Amino acid sequence: KFGGTVDPGHVAAVALYHDATEIFTGDLPTPVKYANPDIQAAYKAIEQNAADRLTATLPEELRPSFSGLLSETDPQVTDLVKAADKLSAYLKCVEELKAGNLEFKKAKEQTYAALCQNPIPALNYFMEHFLSGFELTLDELN
């Protein structure tokens, strides 16, 4: 529908493993990670080191497959994974607010604004056609 050339299965696999290196690095907040080019470059090197360490724990025959998933460089793939990650963060905010946790109000607004700025057609389609359903209660879904 969107004329893309990436393999959706590959994108999904990269998305599943994109945070796996955090078992070694921990989760660095996005504003810190991108505070300046030096920090961003240093963190990329740290993530690559963590990916190498993680891959080294696997049996030899599995390493090539997982190495590619942990170190994806195709911008079409990485842009889709980043968009999905941002969407997931937004949906987490929605769920927290539905549960009464008002600490997520500002994060929801900021994340939504960032999603609206994203030019990926598939993301925009999802937001237009499906996002409102996540705001509904179970009673409203039935």
Predicted regions: what they are:
Residues 1-142:
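Alpha-helical, largely C-terminal catalytic domains
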